[in-house]
Amino acid sequence: MLEVIQTVDETILLWIQETVRQGWLNPLVEFYTTLGNGGLLWIVLSLALLCWRPTRRVGAASLLALAIGFLCTNVAVKPLIQRPRPYTAVEGLIPLLTSGDPNSFPSGHTCAAFAAGLAWGGTCSARGARV
């Protein structure tokens, strides 16, 4: 099963590299990607939510969710699965950015975004805080 997933990934990533990747778009993609590094964007937004009383609970829930997500993803699951990053496993794939973390799955970027979004959605009531 993992071989099938790897083959599909390789095909899609090489197609994107050859068909979609444009030199003028690379800086935008790199910037967008770095926003998610270390959950920085979500941490900054969560800290900002702590500054206003109506959104304080949302900010605290978000920071807690980010911490739990980090522990589950980066400390527990990634070391167990140890799926290599595509640019180390796919021959001919040229990365725009590289990472110090050799494991690609599960995605820390996705975990952080999901954790923050889930916390925001779960703590904002219809009459209460709005984000």
Task: Give the residues covered by each predicted segment.
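Membrane-helix interface segments
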Residues: 24, 54-59, 125-131
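Short alpha-helix boundary/capping motifs
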Residues: 40, 56, 60-61, 104-106
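Interfacial segments of alpha-helical transmembrane regions
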Residues: 45-73
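Membrane-water interface at transmembrane helix exits
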Residues: 49, 73, 77-82, 121, ...
